[in-house]
Amino acid sequence: MLRAGGRRLLAPGLRRVLGGGAAAPVAVGGAKAYHERVVDHYENPRNVGSFENDDPSVGTGLVGAPACGDVMKLQIRVDESSGKIVDACFKTFGCGSAIASSSVATEWVKGKQMEEVVTIKNTEIAKHLSLPPVKLHCSMLAEDAIKAAVKDYEAKKAKLAQKGEEKAAEA
């Protein structure tokens, strides 16, 4: 991705046509641009940042795609009493589709129960963003990052429970 004069250019020779109309990729000179949802989440990513790893209410998923070099860190903060995800954030090093997939994933997991978020499929993210087949790996990373964050949170929770049992046995 290039940045010129405060505006991001999607690729040389491509322009976004702004205004009302269908939410579809814009073709200029035979090349397809990103879908407007990808552009929106890339230019205005939601929930960028990170939480403290040692916070017991935080689960961290770190995944990567060696083929393209994309790396995605997605974190969730869970209300321990309700099991509901109350916040989420991400940091992604990768293409616009990877950043958009991360941004969408954090939006979708907020306010949901842990059991719900592990059912989010990459195909749903890809469909929402209208990702082309060559970019499906970006949505797969987002799905994997969600599952890894949930697994990390559950492992932390189990470790804390075990420590609590050990302390109770010592007393």
UniProtKB/Swiss-Prot annotation:
**Keyword Isomerase recorded:** no
Q: Which domain of life is it from?
A: Eukaryota
State the conditions that upregulate or repress this gene. Down-regulated in roots when grown under iron deficiency conditions.
- Which InterPro entries does the record associate with it? ISCU, NIF_FeS_clus_asmbl_NifU_N
- What would be one Pfam family of this protein? NifU_N
Q: In which pathway does it act?
A: Cofactor biosynthesis; iron-sulfur cluster biosynthesis
Define the transit peptide region by residue numbers: 1-55
One GO CC term, this protein: cytoplasm
GO MF assignments: 2 iron, 2 sulfur cluster binding; ferrous iron binding
Q: Which UniProt keywords apply?
A: 2Fe-2S, Iron, Iron-sulfur, Metal-binding, Mitochondrion, Transit peptide
Q: How is the cofactor bound?
A: Binds 1 [2Fe-2S] cluster per subunit.
Which co-factors does it depend on? [2Fe-2S] cluster
Localization in the cell: Mitochondrion matrix
Q: How does it assemble?
A: Component of the core Fe-S cluster (ISC) assembly machinery.
State the similarity comment. Answer: Belongs to the NifU family.
Role played: Scaffold protein for the de novo synthesis of iron-sulfur (Fe-S) clusters within mitochondria, which is required for maturation of both mitochondrial and cytoplasmic [2Fe-2S] and [4Fe-4S] proteins. First, a [2Fe-2S] cluster is transiently assembled on the scaffold protein ISCU (ISU1, ISU2 or ISU3). In a second step, the cluster is released from ISCU, transferred to a glutaredoxin, followed by the formation of mitochondrial [2Fe-2S] proteins, the synthesis of [4Fe-4S] clusters and their target-specific insertion into the recipient apoproteins.
Q: What is this protein called?
A: Iron-sulfur cluster assembly protein 1
Give the source species.
Answer: Oryza sativa subsp. japonica
